[in-house]
Amino acid sequence: MPTSLTRRHGAIAAALLCLVLVAGLVGCAGPGTGAGEGSGAAGAANSGDTANSTNAAATGDSAPTGHVSAELPPTDPEVLVDDPQPKLPVTVDWDGAEVEVASVDRILTLDRAGALSRMVWALGLGDRLVGRDTATDFPGAADLPQVTPGGHTINAESILKLRPDVVLTDGSIGPSRVLDTLTDAGIPVVRIPDERTPDTIADFATQVATTVGLGEQGEKAGAAIVGKLDAATRDAQTRADGRRMMVLYLRGTTVAMIAGPESGASSLIERLGGVDAAEGLGMDGAFTPLTPEALVKAAPDTVIVMTHGLDSIGGPAGLGSLPGMAQTPAGANASVLDVPDSQLLSFGPDTPRVLAAMADALYGKAAA
């Protein structure tokens, strides 16, 4: 797989191509590279399967109804390392290519979710960030120069002007030739693995920490994040009502995809105490195009979306007009939860706070 695409965002790109080439095509497959592959099973339900498996829309008093939002006001990630003392140089080879990092005085992180910058901040090195990507939207980074003004693309000149000592990326921002140019210019470019779910946050913390010379401190930080996440999980599951949920990735009226297990959506829903409505669709990748048949078969009680994604289709009313949505309990009851784009599937140090905010929105705030 090209280094310019992570598994999750590679799956999105492949699904978008399918949608563009064949509108409404059932069973579009993702790139044939394993984990980034989107299963076509989500769109394979025939009319008989749909008729036999569709759940009647919940209409009782206990049915989740209405539009709710996760309350996540912008805030800096919690700093988990009080006195970071990087031990350098270090040599890392997360993607199979050895890279030596000799200095972390000037750090640049590049990823679509902003998870790398948040982890660097949590490790106590936020003051060493010299630029930011679009998703790095927390207050402490607001004054940093943005190197992705067009969204998710970079150019070598703007980065070279920042004189970074090291660039951390997961490959979700490119093009890859720009990263190659930076390497040719003598800048260490470290590609952090992109396999991130709520269950891999400790590994993610260790990978970033090791790269910046904070290996042991990073392990402790990762353990602290996991402890907070497990506590948020227990709280959410205590209040859960067992509803069926589905995470959708939406961009305008022409892009609608189901988030599968490798996007981290399944684990997130389980931690919320819900049932992943997409489980019965046979998905084994990160994302796959949404079809009316798959939506009706899944029969979610609540749909979870990114805030800007919901806005891009006209809000809850636009969501309700998606083909097949009205035939689901979520559509019949207009049950939707929106979460800030940079938080929903980023899976980093903020995930415990995100999970807690989602649980509060879904089930009501816990009694003090």
Regions found by a protein language model. Name each.
Residues 2-115, 216-246, 364-368:
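Bacterial Sec-exported substrate-binding components of ABC uptake systems
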Residues 84, 105-162, 166-171, 277:
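A short, structured surface patch at a secondary-structure boundary
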Residues 147-155, 195, 282-290:
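Short helix-initiation/N-cap motifs at beta->coil->alpha
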Residues 175-178, 190-207, 242-267, 311-314:
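Extracytoplasmic ligand-binding site segments that recognize negatively charged/polar headgroups
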